[in-house]
Amino acid sequence: MIFVGANSSPAFVRLHKIVTDQNMWAVEDASPYILHYIYNSILNKREKVMTYKEIRKNKEIKAFIKRAGINLTSLGFTDHSEVHTTLVADRAAAILKEFGYDEHTIELAKIAGYMHDIGNAVNRTHHAEYGAILANDILKGTDMPLEDRVTVVSCIGNHDESTGGATDPVSAAVIIGDKTDVRRNRVSNKDKSSFDIHDRVNYAVTEASLKINADKKVISLNLQIDESICTMYDYFDIFLQRMIMCRGAAGVLGAKFKLTANGSKVL
């Protein structure tokens, strides 16, 4: 190869290799000046990988998550605060890690899981679609590569059971992480006498555990339900569609989804 230096004269030199995690350049060598120029050119062209840690520090994202939680609490829904979004992110990461996915895919699942409910800051109805639009707008202002942004946006737009479904490993893990977050302390209403069916169903769950068995390719949600608070019929009236969605998501990961309630296999 021929490189032109600052004085515009060709420089011919020995073979050198400059290696980065994305590129390998073979040059018929050059002065330190030329090598330095090439190396910096490579670094400047590389797209920065946005991390989950950086996303969690983003003030705009945190503001939307906070508003989403406030909106749904005021409307009488269960907890959708940062506690929920963090749990979904952690659970999605654990699923993909157990199934052997690479760190980058896991990182995208954590980001999408953390951001998945921001659309509730606009409105509960169509919150997945609103969230996808918001996420795309916010992430455009970061250093996240386009392909990664599209993956996150698609996941958010497809996470709701009424309109979406798993389309790739990231969305599959986030869907399972989201739909299996069933716990008593998600109930924001403290007045038991005014519980609606959603409150009763969540409050009735005294114990919930998600188990991931990559060897057997099985993801299991095991629940203990206080039937004096909520009947099994009530539970499945509310959650059956979500559990079926989890089954489809597990299929995308090449696994099966199983549900047990009070020791009995249900799904």
Residue ranges and their predicted role:
Residues S9-R14, V19, D29-L35:
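Short, low-complexity intrinsically disordered segments enriched in A/P/G/S/L with frequent Arg
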Residues T73-S74, T78, V83-H84, K97-I212:
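Divalent metal-dependent catalytic cores for phosphoryl transfer on phosphate-bearing substrates
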Residues P32-V49:
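Short, Lys/Arg-enriched N-terminal segments with co-localized hydrophobic residues
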Residues Y37, D181-L267:
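Terminal helices and disordered tails flanking the catalytic cores of nucleotide-processing hydrolases
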Residues M1-P10:
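Extreme N-terminal basic, low-complexity initiation segments
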Residues Y52-I70:
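Short alpha-helical hairpin
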Residues L87, R91-I95:
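N-terminal low-complexity or amphipathic/hydrophobic leaders
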